Amino acid sequence: MSELIQNVKTSFEQVLGYAPSHIIQAPGRVNLIGEHTDYNDGFVLPCAINYQTVVAAAKREDNIVRVVSVDYGNAVDEFDITQAITFQQDKMWANYIRGVVKCLLARGYSFTGADISVSGNVPQGAGLSSSAALEVVIGQTFKVLFNLEISQAEIALNGQQAENEFVGCNCGIMDQMISAEGRENHAMLLDCRSLETESVSMPEEMAVVIINSNKKRGLVDSEYNTRRQQCEEAARIFGVKALRDVTIEQFNEKVAELDEMVAKRARHVITENDRTVEAAQALRAHDMKRMGELMAESHASMRDDFEITVKEIDTLVEIVKEVIGDQGGVRMTGGGFGGCIVALVPPALVDDVKATVAAKYQAATGLKESIYVCQAKDGAGLVEVL
């Protein structure tokens, strides 16, 4: 993070002509288990990771917000918070920031503008929530600069609202919530219906290894929408608000009445919810053998019932599983059809995992992986007052 801090300080001083007063950060995240459960009102178990978005900031008194994006060649966006805050077609990065500010104002928070320089190292397009980290760090920045009475949960909800309503991208609450509320060496069990969270301690030093298959993700949006509709149809047939409300026993009684495809989709969600709650217990007990079994079952369910994995992802999972055995766990993470796998790996095996993947993955698939070795880290907050 020190390089990011240096970059935002330098760009702030060069472009805006004076020194910032505060450094704030918000992390990306990875979901350990609980896939496609969020929009079914279910459970997820993410952790925040040590890739983050960092801001250098200072308050203004004239209702102007000026933002410098280090990652877009020090491009600048400027707007007046007393005027209508509008969507910028030609500056997509700026819309996340404008949306967060607009939603904060609509929620009744008062502040008088800010100068902000922002940079991040959360890999974009890998499904590690670079957009949520940006939304949360901007909310956190206004909280810090103006001592706003806003909870971390509301910073998360505000970021989600900005993405849904201003940017126009439909997302659940998980990404923002873990970025805002994460804890070092802990995962977070999140109930996507009540938004209650529970910190789940992880074995210290356990590496969270994220491997991007670099398989270009096709069909994601259309397939995602189809899965969502199938889940909603299953919930209707069961007469419940969401699949969260169906037990596996109820499912088994009624499975014959369901269309085969809908049944497979529903079975994934129902069993995945149970697995996620049990995984939190296993992780808390530092029972990595059980955690590994649950992650393996989750992957098989995504592959066979939800049908969202691809050959490259299945290959990566198999390669990693060979190395870690029952000392950790591995599964696809994220929306599917490419993207990443996540593995919980004892530190002593991290180099073996990297070497084995390097030796076998490209030979099997023709693609070169990207590996990120992470730890579970704290959520958003103030880094330093300058």
Swiss-Prot record:
Mg(2+) binds at residues 131, 163. Belongs to the GHMP kinase family. GalK subfamily. The gene is galK. One of its GO terms (cellular component) is cytosol. InterPro entries: Galactokinase (IPR000705), Galactokinase_bac (IPR022963), Galactokinase_CS (IPR019741), GalKase_N (IPR019539), GHMP_kinase_C_dom (IPR013750), GHMP_kinase_C_sf (IPR036554), GHMP_kinase_N_dom (IPR006204), GHMP_knse_ATP-bd_CS (IPR006203). It is found in: Cytoplasm. Substrate binds at residues 35-38, 224. GO terms for biological process: galactose metabolic process. SUPFAM superfamilies: GHMP Kinase, C-terminal domain, Ribosomal protein S5 domain 2-like. Pfam families: GalKase_gal_bdg (PF10509), GHMP_kinases_C (PF08544), GHMP_kinases_N (PF00288). It comes from Vibrio vulnificus (strain CMCP6). Catalyzes the transfer of the gamma-phosphate of ATP to D-galactose to form alpha-D-galactose-1-phosphate (Gal-1-P). The active site is at residue 175. ATP binds at residues 69, 125-131. It catalyses: alpha-D-galactose + ATP = alpha-D-galactose 1-phosphate + ADP + H(+). Its EC number is 2.7.1.6. Gene3D superfamilies: 3.30.230.10, GHMP kinase, C-terminal domain. Pathway: Carbohydrate metabolism; galactose metabolism. This is Galactokinase. It comes from the Bacteria. The record marks 29 as: Transition state stabilizer. One of its GO terms (molecular function) is ATP binding. Keywords: ATP-binding, Carbohydrate metabolism, Cytoplasm, Galactose metabolism, Kinase, Magnesium, Metal-binding, Nucleotide-binding, Transferase.
